[in-house]
């Protein structure tokens, strides 16, 4: 868990900072800039395969979840999940993001709750619990390879959205710190889940969804609630995978998105009948190895580009500070002194000049407009703004 936590924190920092530096709107922007065109294409294909593979594994998992807790036929839970994904997938991206975001707190609460209960009800013989956990069969025997493979899998899932989230933050420095904080939080949650499973390995062994078995053993009613939460977790992942897959395959042909999205979901539904555990045992390790390679490539590119990234971070932060001074109604701005400096920094940036200027103006005007102590009206500013004043 410690090794996985360190890798996750480093990779989170790398993904978000590279996304910010290249102002990425999709993962290919970064892949194309840091690797050979052939490698970039292979990474893109690997991400596409991952999106589809995890999508159909989630549909299978939805069926197993409901079968384990309520005794439903697996196809019922999978079909219900398919319908939910198809309905929500037809919404616009902002609404999809809100649906996904609404589910996340319940997941965190559930994991913390199980960990607290486990801590208050530790097994009498911790050594026996550890021994029992070591007897559980895993797709990958070696503990170190297993930790690396798990990281590869998780990061392969996260890379596409992480690069885009990083690209939405104009400051590489802030994006990097966001990656550190996110990696630490993820590591804590992973540690809590691992602790719970380790101390209750006798109850979790043999079940498709171990965490559900733990909660159901405590109380069947809580088990039913947990089954619903896990179903929401599965939905969270499934909609993210199939939606991203549809967007990627319809890039440049956005009107085709609904058809591609529906076909992708139906194809995933068909494959899901191979069974959740079977799919996990074969699909997850393969994706994990692809993820290890991808992380190694991006981390190497990040280390190699550190000086440029840091220079760009300083450059953008300096322009932002000068723009704040320039637009603040209560501060004196020396145009003769600073206009040329702003223009030079923008020219030196790796970002498109107009895109960088517009992004920084948007950030600064949003901040000033939201400050009750500053007499600044963003709408009036935009009405009176006719050109980019740094030109």
Model segments located where?
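Transmembrane-helix boundary/entry motifs in multi-pass membrane transporters
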Residues: 1, 22-50, 68-73, 211-226, ...
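Transmembrane alpha-helical segments of multi-pass small-molecule transport proteins
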Residues: 6, 41-48, 68-92, 154-161, ...
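Juxtamembrane transmembrane-helix boundary signature
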Residues: 2-28, 196-200
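Hydrophobic alpha-helical segments and their helix-loop junctions in multi-pass secondary transporters
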Residues: 107-133, 295-315
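Membrane-water interface regions at transmembrane-helix termini and the short interhelical loops
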Residues: 21, 58-68, 82-103, 167-171, ...
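Hydrophobic, membrane-embedded alpha-helices of multi-pass small-molecule transporters
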Residues: 1, 47-51, 55, 117-122, ...
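Long, low-complexity, intrinsically disordered cytosolic termini of multi-pass membrane proteins
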Residues: 314-391
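Small-residue-rich segments of transmembrane alpha-helices in multi-pass membrane proteins
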Residues: 34-42, 104-119, 182-194, 260-266, ...
């Amino acid at each position: 868990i410690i090794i996985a936590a360190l890798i996750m924190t480093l990779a989170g920092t790398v993904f978000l900072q590279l996304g910010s530096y290249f102002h990425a709107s999709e993962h290919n922007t970064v892949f194309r800039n840091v690797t050979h065109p052939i490698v970039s294409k292979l990474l893109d294909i690997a991400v596409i395969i991952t999106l589809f593979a995890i999508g159909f594994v989630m549909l299978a998992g939805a069926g197993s979840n409901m079968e384990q807790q309520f005794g439903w036929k697996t196809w019922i839970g999978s079909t219900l999940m398919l319908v939910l994904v198809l309905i929500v997938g037809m919404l616009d991206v902002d609404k999809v993001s809100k649906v996904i975001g609404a589910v996340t707190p319940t997941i965190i609460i559930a994991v913390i709750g199980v960990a607290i209960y486990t801590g208050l009800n530790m097994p009498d013989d911790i050594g026996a619990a550890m021994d029992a956990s070591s007897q559980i069969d895993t797709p990958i025997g070696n503990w170190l390879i297993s930790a690396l493979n798990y990281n590869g899998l998780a990061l392969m899932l996260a890379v596409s959205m992480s690069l885009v989230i990083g690209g939405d933050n104009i400051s590489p420095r802030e994006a990097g710190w966001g990656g550190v904080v996110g990696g630490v939080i993820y590591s804590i949650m992973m540690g809590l889940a691992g602790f719970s499973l380790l101390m209750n390995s006798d109850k979790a062994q043999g079940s498709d969804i171990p965490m559900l078995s733990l909660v159901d053993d405590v109380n069947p009613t809580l088990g039913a609630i947990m089954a619903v939460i896990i179903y929401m977790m599965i939905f969270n992942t499934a909609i993210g995978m199939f939606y991203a897959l549809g967007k990627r395959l319809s890039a440049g042909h956005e009107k085709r998105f609904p058809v591609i999205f529906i076909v992708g979901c139906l194809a995933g539904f068909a494959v899901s009948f191979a069974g959740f555990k079977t799919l996990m045992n074969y699909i997850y390790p393969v994706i994990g190895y692809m993820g290890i390679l991808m992380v190694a490539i991006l981390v190497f590119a990040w280390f190699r580009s550190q000086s440029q990234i840091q220079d760009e971070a300083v450059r953008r932060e300096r322009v932002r500070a000068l723009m704040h001074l320039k637009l603040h109604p209560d501060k004196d701005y020396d145009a003769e002194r600073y206009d040329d400096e702003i223009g030079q920094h923008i020219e030196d940036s790796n970002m498109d000049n107009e895109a960088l200027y517009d992004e920084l103006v948007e950030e600064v005007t949003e901040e000033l407009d939201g400050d009750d102590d500053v007499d600044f009206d963003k709408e009036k500013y935009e009405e009176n703004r006719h050109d980019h004043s740094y030109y």
